[in-house]
Amino acid sequence: MKVLVLGDVIIDKYIYGTSTRISPEAPVPIVNLDNIKTSLGGAGLVYENLKSLDVDIELFETNQPRSIKTRVICDGHYITRIDDDAQSSGTDVLDLVKSTDFSPYDYVVLSDYNKGVLDEAKDIIKYINTFGCKVI
């Protein structure tokens, strides 16, 4: 069984640190950086989870901008999240989809986080179905 994941890939970034003082500019902690962790989110996380189950899987690359969700954790407490949301062009993605041969795949998993990749989902599904793939 071969699976393709198509959707909004998000980058999840975690900034970990500690604090021993408050900023003089505003009543917020000054975070001393300890560690930064970056991982895939959105459709990328769906891909990673299926891959961990030994599924023969690929991630559809759209060359579209990716949203980045940065979370700041200080002394074990979630302080804030900074979103750098990128919107993809659904029509550009549809053109890319229509230039792709989906016949090697048994399943195509659509993962929509409302970032634009699947704005044309109806047409994407219609095209993929012509290859006999099951769309989830």
Q: Which residues make up each language-model segment?
A:
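Ribokinase/PfkB-type carbohydrate-kinase core domain
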Residues: 1-20, 34-136
